[in-house]
A protein has these predicted regions:
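Active-site-adjacent structural elements that line small-molecule/cofactor binding pockets in enzymes
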Residues: 1-289
Length: 289
């Protein structure tokens, strides 16, 4: 089992010195990855239901919390580290132009030596889509097409694509990623997200917990798509009780993420960069689990 750090670009880690300190401490302690969050803009009020709380609202202080652009934050700490992977967890893909995202992600992967993991989601905050001028109603369908576009640009010698939203023939987007692909981790808590992960993802990230039923849906969707049952890596949040790590391993979880703040009510959090070292023994103990 692998361990990553979550919410790395939030709150205090918007500060450049603290960002580097966190990234370097995580790498030194044996964490395999740094995971960032994204909201380009947060409306002061909204009717959309936040899916990860009982009352459908974000926790207090999250609306105006500093939240740097995840890809730029990752590029910044990439220059101060050498091994730790750099992940979005998640990037709200249908809010973006997929050709531009493909370029940005490939550039970051190229410059960091192949360390990027692209976690994607369809988003939940309609008001944010409205501010950005992005389509909310068809965001799932757009996500599927955008993934196909990025993979074409990353891997093809002569990229061409004919889709519902984008079409191009012989469009070069260089440099390509180090391995001509970047692992795509599908985030979400719904059946649709789990099926998308099984059908086309390299990973699945149910944001809270590791529901066995969602993991089963991922495996079923992978099999239906003609993919191996273990083709999709499972990442989830660190349980509040470390004794649950064995249970998660038995469910097929490959990676757990330790929050670096108490964002969203999560209680298992680092006290600061200096706190990363205390995880060394836990990481070593579960390295082959």
């Amino acid at each position: 089992m692998k361990f990553g750090l979550r919410y790395c670009n939030t709150g205090p880690y918007a500060d450049p010195l603290k960002a580097v300190a966190l990234a370097q401490a995580g790498e030194a302690a044996g964490f395999d990855s740094l995971w960032t969050a994204e909201h380009t803009v947060m409306p002061e009020s909204y009717a959309s239901a936040y899916p990860y709380s009982a009352d459908g609202k974000l926790a207090g202080g999250m609306t105006d919390m500093p939240l740097p652009d995840p890809l730029i934050w990752m590029a910044y700490v990439a220059a101060a580290t050498s091994r730790i992977k750099l992940a979005t967890g998640i990037l709200i893909l249908p809010q973006h132009n997929p050709v531009l995202v493909a370029k940005q992600v490939a550039t970051l992967d190229h410059l960091s030596g192949g360390r990027v993991l692209l976690g994607i989601g369809v988003g939940w905050l309609k008001e944010e889509f409205d501010i950005l001028g992005a389509s909310f109603a068809d965001r799932g369908k757009r996500t599927d097409e955008y993934v196909a576009i990025m993979r074409e640009l990353w891997s093809a010698d002569r990229p061409s694509f004919q889709g519902e939203y984008f079409r191009f023939d012989g469009a070069y987007c260089r440099p390509q990623p180090v391995n001509k692909r970047v692992p795509i981790i599908v985030g979400g808590h719904t059946r649709a997200a789990a099926e998308r992960a099984g059908r086309l993802g390299d990973g699945f990230f149910p944001a809270r917990g590791a529901p066995a039923e969602l993991i089963a849906i991922v495996r079923q969707a992978a099999a239906k798509a003609g993919r191996p049952a273990d083709a999709v890596e499972i990442t989830t949040s660190m349980p509040e009780d470390p004794a649950d790590l064995d249970r998660l391993s038995n469910l097929g979880v490959d990676r757990v993420l330790v929050p670096v703040t108490g964002l969203g009510g999560l209680k298992t959090a680092l006290a600061g960069p200096e706190d990363a070292a205390r995880w060394r023994d836990t990481i070593a103990r579960h390295a082959t689990a």
